[in-house]
Structure formats: structure tokens, C-alpha cells
Amino acid sequence: MVGSRTSPIFNALRVELNAREAELVEIPLIQPADPFLDMAGEDLRRRIFLTENENGDSLCLRPEFTIPVCRNHIALNAATPKRYAYLGEVFRQRRDGAAEFLQAGIEDLGAADEAASDARSLADALSCVKAIAPDAPLEIVLGDQSVFAGMLKALGLPQGWRKKLLRSFGDAHSMDLALAELTGTQRRDPLPESLAVLVAEGDEIGLARMLEAEMLEAGISPGAGRTPVEIARRLIEKEDLAATHFPAAALDLLRQFLAIRVSLDMAAVTLRAFAADNALDLGAVLQKFEARADAIAQAGIEMKDIIYDASFGRPLDYYTGLVYEIRDASNRQDGVLAGGGRYDRLLTMLGACEAIPGVGFSIWLDRLQALAGEKQ
């Protein structure tokens, strides 16, 4: 395993987390797989170590902490606001490097002041990184999925296309493919006739049954990766979306928006000018954006040191607003030290009886250890 529970970095981070009014929780290593498969995003789904218990239930080694920390909060029926800290192993299949490594972080649940809790999350993550590597050159990149969602709405895109593009947010390759589909320039491979009939009829149940049968016949577990129901839903959705094309001028505006990359102190004025020049109604989302930027400044973080990238997202499906990464500025290829964001719908999706907003971050201890120059 990269990193160690006995290393000075591990202990120093424990001290940092304890100083931030967060309850340190222990989360089991073995987790039910379905919440991760349903909500964690395509990139993480491919990396999960899956297994089954004797009852056939899908289980996995813990691939991240946010989902199980939120499930634990719901199971305890705990009051909010509540802050949880964690420090422990996660397991992901990697082409290179160790599959088991340490993460630390804080999940802030139920805070009423969204702007202040967003700013606190970023400030906490930055403080933890600087406590371990005080002299390291850092780059902070911030995005906002809610601003992107507001842009899609202002352009008048149908709901189905909004959902598809939101799923692609932050993944440049996926976004390029989605935009090519929207213009009708991306040709789709034809489906087998037996599947095509069910897709054309919108028969999600029948299609899922056929897909499950084909997966079993091919020796593929229906619980490995996307479920047959999810695949069926996506195929039907693709058929519906294929019939929709969007004006080239509107798509050009969307590409211009995604190209915006400025320091945070210039972001709000840049976005307002873009909206005004193109008659786009982004007032509500930009008001929240500005409130957060003000809160970040009040938290003592220099806004000129933060990059706002309109196309920046993180490869986890549960984010809804703020997303950010703290990176090693000297390592552009694999330099993400910490990442986080807001996930206001996640707890409801996990079974909470009422809406509970959340924001949190994770730190990669192996990368932070390498940056700090600590000997393993």
C-alpha cells in the first residue's frame, strides 16, 4: 500500500482534521456495490473491485468515502448540520501503481449557508495540503456544474439533452461526442434488430430483460458495471435524443462558454458580460456564484490565485454545484492532491427522508507524501 497509517503525514493529517470540528468516523472496508455503481460515475465504476456474498448481493471494496459516509449518516438518523472526517484506505483498479491507497477528507452535511460551507470546504482542503507541503507550488482550479446547467437552460435545450450534457460535464472527450451527436455529425453504430425494435417502442422492461439474458449467456454478471435497466434506459434515451438537433449558433455559444478560463476575481464579471452580450438569463446562478466567491475571499483565500474553468468538472456523477481541485503545479499529468465539491441531491438518492445539502473533499495521501518528499 502507498502511504502508511504510521507515517508522520498520516498523523499530521489526523491532527488537522481534528482541529476542524469534524467527527472522525470509521467506515467498513466492504460496502454494498449498488450505490457506487448507480451514482459514482463511469470512471470510478470501471475501477471498483466487485465481489458477491453467499446470498448473491453485490459487494465491493471501498472505492471512496463520500457515499458510505452519507449512508452512515442516514443510518444513524443523525441531526444536521454535521461534519464528518475520515482517514483510511480506498481500493481502485489502476493500470499503473498501487490499487490500495490512503485518503483523508471532510464531508459537511446540512449546512444552511451554501456559500460559506463551499468556501470552508475549499479552505479546509487547502489548509490540510499546506500543513503537509507548506512550500509546494499549488494550482487551484474551480468549476461550477450549476452554472453549466443554467447555461443549458438559457439556451433552451430539451431536458433530455441537458441531462446528457450534464453527465458529460468535466469530461472533454465525452462532451465532444455529445456535441457531435447534438449537431447530427456523429454517426451511431446500428443496434441489432432484436434490440432496435424494443428501443424504438420504448420498451424499457423488455429491453432490460433481453440485455440481462445476453449478458448471462456471455458470462457477464449483470451487476458488473452498468445494470441492464440502466443500459436499456440509456439506449432508449439515445434514440429519443437522436431525433433532436440544435441550431449551430446556440452550439457555438455553448462552446464559447466552455472555453472561459479566468482567475476567480474576474470570473463573475466575465460571465455576466458573456450573458449580457448573448441575451442569456443566468442571473440566478451567477448570484450564487458571486456569493460563493465573496465567501472564499472572506475565508482568506486569494481569488486571483484560483482559476475558474467553465468546462471543469470532476468524474463523479453526484456533484451538483461547486467542484474544485488542488494540484501540484509542477506535475501537470498526475498532480491532483485534493478534490471536492457540492452534492445536494446525493443523500436523497441514498434514501434520506428529507433534502440534506452536502459538500466535501478528499486528499490523496500518496501524492501528498511524494510532494512533501517523505521517505516511504
UniProtKB/Swiss-Prot annotation:
Pathway: Amino-acid biosynthesis; L-histidine biosynthesis; L-histidine from 5-phospho-alpha-D-ribose 1-diphosphate: step 1/9. Keywords: Amino-acid biosynthesis, Cytoplasm, Histidine biosynthesis. It is found in: Cytoplasm. SUPFAM superfamilies: Class II aaRS and biotin synthetases (SSF55681). InterPro entries: aa-tRNA-synth_II/BPL/LPL (IPR045864), HisRS-like_core (IPR041715), HisRS/HisZ (IPR004516), HisZ (IPR004517). GO terms for cellular component: cytoplasm. One of its GO terms (biological process) is histidyl-tRNA aminoacylation. Coiled coil: none annotated. One of its GO terms (molecular function) is histidine-tRNA ligase activity. NCBIfam families: PRK12295.1-1, PRK12295.1-4. Heteromultimer composed of HisG and HisZ subunits. This function is generally fulfilled by the C-terminal part of HisG, which is missing in some bacteria such as this one. Required for the first step of histidine biosynthesis. May allow the feedback regulation of ATP phosphoribosyltransferase activity by histidine. Belongs to the class-II aminoacyl-tRNA synthetase family. HisZ subfamily. This is ATP phosphoribosyltransferase regulatory subunit. The lineage of its organism: Bacteria, Pseudomonadati, Pseudomonadota, Alphaproteobacteria, Hyphomicrobiales.
